Amino acid sequence: APSAASQKETVQAAFDEFADRIFKEELSAASTLDLHYIVTDPESCGIETGPPTLGTFRLTNLIQGNAEAKAVKAQLEEFDVSSLAFDQQVLYDTLMETLDAALMAEGLELYEQPLSPTIGVQAQLPILLAEYEFNCKADIENYLALLEQLDQYYGQLLEFEFQKADAGLGLSDEGIDAIASSCEGYLIPPEENFLTESFDARLETFSGGQSAKDNAGLLTD
């Protein structure tokens, strides 16, 4: 029969494989924006990347996400914590706390509040885009592709807000006014918009101070 030490090694190896798989699956499913801020070189970590995407924000996705979290928790619970190494036990506890926190929202998906005056998506997304670093030409191409998806993504947010309103969970008039006010700064002429200015600055930094004409060529090569 396998020794106790051998059994622990087997459990620890299985846990490492589980953690690695969950890490890759989560990041492979992440939006291009999220992935860019987490990992510099996804391929070197074994993370598969598809076409650039802002992701989706739909009620069905929230429900599916909770179902997936429940499935991952069930897999996590199969491990004997006492057989794990100390660092694995720390990761186990962290994962369990994260999953438990996520599952507190199960059945309450329509209470999700993606829009709010100061920390809503409409306030955070432009800032994240403005701080999106250009480390290679693909980053620039992905960034431009993300900009093309903004209308579609905001359309999904609007549809979700209509679903909330139909369920009696819509924003108050004051909340809507505050959110609208928070968007006014993004409605200035494009040539004066901070996203345009930051794009030009990042492009110049990436190209080593080349002229605007040379930068235009960089994008069309």
Please give the residue ranges for each predicted region.
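N-terminal maturation segment of proteins
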Residues: 3-221
